[in-house]
Swiss-Prot record:
Belongs to the mitochondrial carrier (TC 2.A.29) family. It comes from Caenorhabditis elegans. The chain crosses the membrane at residues 5-25, 69-89, 104-124, 172-192, 209-229, 261-282. The gene is dif-1. This is Protein dif-1. The keyword Transport applies.
């Protein structure tokens, strides 16, 4: 079994761990981002992240926090493959020599290209995930009811064909290009800083987790406004925003102001470290198992593997 395949499998395990740990935070984020503006005299649907968790669990049960998880879980391995491929192509296009070390800007360029590639795979899963996440128990009168991921695909296709399934592509590009650029450049920069100088640079597990966690924060720090617009566009009724993300932006700024573009900030930041820690734990454990059982040659340790910036 080739080392490329082994690293792909390990990456898939790491990505799955990320989804499982991070999805409840993501559900809270999406619900806060998409909650309707309260009418004069009315209280908001959720007063914050903790209130969203309490209300969701009390009304729908604990596993409501995992609504829509199937789509990112199924897509995480191919997403890793596309992301790694995009990074490799981005680096190859800029290198004059295979051993050339990439600069901060070059890594950002490679990450940006990878963000374009992953969007193609990511959009349908994001659309399905968001629609299931905002669907609440006892809300049959609020719109279309979905019984699961396949039912979402079937109903979206019936409503508007493939274009409905891929709604939010532009918004996802607006989110993932700068986010992936920030993630890869910060991760590679911190990896070099933490591993020291010399030919035998090594990175401890703790430093690896720190680099991944800080890179995750950098990733989300630059893309939350675009993520808010994407979530609203992908969960809106058919035909509400005929001019796409521009219509969402105008409505948000007109009705709620610029601060609304940062809704869901704390759930996103709170999930950055545990989600990345879970990713590296799954990655390391799988690679260690391959080495223990003598499978393949020498699969690349996680210090050389770049985890995905977006688990879902």
């Amino acid at each position: 079994m080739s080392d490329v395949l082994l690293n792909f499998i390990a990456g898939g395990v790491g990505g799955s761990c990320t989804v499982i740990v991070g999805h409840p935070f993501d559900t809270v984020k999406v619900r806060i981002q998409t909650m309707p503006m309260p009418k004069p005299g009315e209280k908001p649907q959720f007063t914050g992240a903790l209130d969203c968790v309490k209300r969701t669990v009390s009304k729908e049960g604990f596993f409501a926090l995992y609504k829509g998880m199937a789509a990112p879980l199924v897509g995480v391995s191919p997403l890793f493959a596309v992301f790694f491929g995009g990074c490799a192509v981005g680096k190859w296009l800029q290198q004059t020599d295979p051993s050339q070390e990439m600069t901060f800007i070059q890594n950002a360029n490679a990450g940006a290209l990878a963000g374009v590639f992953t969007t193609i795979v990511m959009v349908p899963g994001e659309r399905i995930k968001c629609l299931l996440q905002v669907q609440q128990a006892g809300s049959a009168g609020s719109g279309v009811h979905y019984d699961g991921p396949l039912d979402v695909v079937k109903k979206l296709y019936k409503q508007g064909g493939i274009s409905s399934i891929y709604r939010g592509t532009g918004a996802t590009l607006l989110r993932d290009i700068p986010a992936s650029a920030a993630y890869l450049s910060v991760y590679e920069y911190l990896k070099k800083k933490f591993s020291g100088e010399g030919a035998q640079r090594t990175l401890s597990p703790g430093a690896t987790l720190m680099a991944g966690g800080l890179a995750g924060i950098a990733n989300w720090g630059v893309c939350i406004p675009a993520d808010v617009l994407k979530s609203r566009l992908q969960t809106a009724p058919e035909g509400k925003y005929p001019d796409g993300i521009r219509g969402v932006l105008r409505e948000v700024l007109r009705e709620e102001g610029p601060r609304a573009l940062f809704k869901g900030f704390w759930p996103v930041m709170l999930r950055a470290f545990p989600a990345n820690a879970a990713c590296f734990f799954g990655l390391e454990l799988t690679l260690a198992a391959f080495r223990y059982f003598g499978i393949g040659g020498h699969p690349t340790p996680s210090t050389e593997v770049v985890p995905l910036p977006h688990d879902e």
